[in-house]
Amino acid sequence: MKLENHRFSFDFVALEKLDTSPGDLFMLCHPHNPVGTAYTKAELHQFAEWIISRNLYLCSDEIHCDLILDSESKHFPIANISPELAKHCITLMAPSKTFNLSGFGCSFAIISEPELRVKFKKACQ
């Protein structure tokens, strides 16, 4: 993350320097917690290209998607960027943060790629 004009955003220069291997998992908090950045579609597209180009998996924690306080910003699920990215993506969501339901025990993972869903289920056992 980098701070520019009072807003945190992706540091794509730093991302390019990361040592990654195909199949590695990258965790994203979207919108970002604790800084609250709701990424723009342009930022998400650029980030998606980086994920796909390196053949990484992306786990996007979008539990705060309903807690965007900036009326100018909107949440856009990163898996909706492209069908290609969706194949690499695990999206995590739950009502507990937004609706003050801690202890409710209701969360879910959206995984459109069947093989990735199988890997996720095995990892959860």
Predicted regions and their residues:
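Hydrophobic residues at beta-strand termini and immediately following loops
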Residues: 1, 78, 92
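Active-site phosphate-binding strand-loop segment of PLP-dependent enzymes
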Residues: 3-73
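Short secondary-structure boundary/capping segments
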Residues: 17-18, 81-83
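A conserved amphipathic alpha-helix that caps or lines the catalytic cleft of carbohydrate-
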Residues: 51, 79-82
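Nucleotide phosphate-binding site architecture
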Residues: 65, 79, 117
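Substrate-gripping "pore-loop 1 plus following alpha2 helix"
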Residues: 72-76, 86
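A structural preference for long, well-packed, hydrophobic secondary-structure segments
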Residues: 75-78, 108
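Conserved core segment of the aminotransferase class I/II
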Residues: 82-125
